[in-house]
């Protein structure tokens, strides 16, 4: 899936993200392309199922993981028509900084972006939304 790396590169180009990924969530349920060396590279099918699953409440209470990194769900509009995004924040383990994460849902793929320290979640949400809309409009 080397062609998908250009989408990740596009998400990274403005310098506000430390990581980005394109992840299949239908039949090809795995990471299609991701920033090298990041946590998104390690996202598992079980983690994908948690994000796109029918239970839209459990992760507010229990959190979720992305590439084994513990996270809290801030806002879930993944299945809201016209939005199709989710806002997440990493949890601090051992005093390291926390980061905003946004997920955008297209027809067959999820777009993940993680901001650098201090990057506001609203801009990340717009970035994930825009790429997911472009991919959805392109048949993905």
Swiss-Prot record:
Organism: Homo sapiens (Human)
Subcellular location: Cytoplasm, Cytoskeleton
One GO term describing the cellular component: cytoskeleton
Protein name (Swiss-Prot/TrEMBL): Profilin-2
Gene3D superfamilies referenced in this protein's UniProt entry, alphabetically: Dynein light chain 2a, cytoplasmic (3.30.450.30)
Molecular function in Gene Ontology: actin binding; actin monomer binding; ATP hydrolysis activity; phosphatidylinositol-4,5-bisphosphate binding
Swiss-Prot/TrEMBL GO biological process terms: modification of postsynaptic actin cytoskeleton; negative regulation of actin filament polymerization; negative regulation of epithelial cell migration; negative regulation of ruffle assembly; positive regulation of actin filament bundle assembly; positive regulation of actin filament polymerization; positive regulation of ATP-dependent activity; positive regulation of peptidyl-serine phosphorylation
Tissue/organ expression: Highly expressed in brain, skeletal muscle and kidney and less strongly in heart, placenta, lung and liver.
